[in-house]
Design a protein with these regions (language model features):
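Flexible, glycine-rich phosphate/dinucleotide-binding loops
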Residues: 9, 31-32, 142
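Short, well-ordered alpha-helices that flank and scaffold nucleotide-derived cofactor binding pockets
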Residues: 14-18, 101-102, 156
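Residues at the starts of beta-strands that form the adenosine-phosphate
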Residues: 21-22
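Conserved acidic E/D residue at the C-terminus of a beta-strand in Rossmann-like folds
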Residues: 27
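C-terminal helix-to-coil terminal segments
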Residues: 119-174
Length: 174
């Protein structure tokens, strides 16, 4: 399920579709997006509850609005199947973080997050210490030389990883 069918949601859907995943898009304007490439099905927010129990992956790519603020809460998360995943590349306030932590302790398989209700994420947040949570910076912009710097950092860290050396920029929980 991809919640948000703007340019980012559409790009994500095309990638998931290429991997033979059944992609359900959630949007405010179902009629406008009914034939959008990459989506097998398009539904509105009111119909979303029917699709949640069959959803293995929820990808948030929506704007923060009155409708999406706190959308991913305990009621939503409790309907997801055992072992499902949440990916948030939207806005932190779309997710109730306390409810997410509870769901991760009970039945979610994991979460991939680059946005949080309060940024930066508090150093004492339990999300930092959860082994099935991936946290990354929310970077939408690039600068001259960005790709080269990322490639060099990746290669350096790959070499370090393969030789058992510490990685650069790795966060270690205290």
């Amino acid at each position: 399920m991809v919640i948000g069918m703007g340019p980012i949601g559409q790009k994500i859907a095309r990638i998931l579709s290429a991997m033979d995943m059944h992609v359900v898009g959630v949007t405010r304007d179902e009629a406008k997006h009914r034939t959008t490439e990459g989506f097998n099905q398009v539904i509105d927010f009111e119909s979303m509850g029917q699709a949640i129990p069959q959803t293995q992956y929820v990808v948030l790519a929506c704007p923060l609005t009155c409708q999406t603020h706190g959308l991913i809460n305990g009621a939503f998360l409790s309907q997801l199947p055992q072992g499902s995943f949440l990916i948030n590349v939207a806005r932190g306030q779309v997710v109730n973080q306390n409810d997410l932590v509870e769901a991760l302790h009970s039945h979610l398989g994991g979460a991939f997050l680059d946005v949080f209700a309060t940024e930066p994420l508090e150093s004492d947040s339990p999300l930092w210490r959860m082994p099935h949570v991936m946290i990354s910076p929310h970077t939408a912009g690039h600068f001259t030389g960005y790709a080269e710097k990322v490639a060099l950092l990746f290669m350096h860290n790959l070499n370090n990883y393969l030789s058992g050396q510490p990685l650069l920029n790795e966060w270690q929980p205290s």
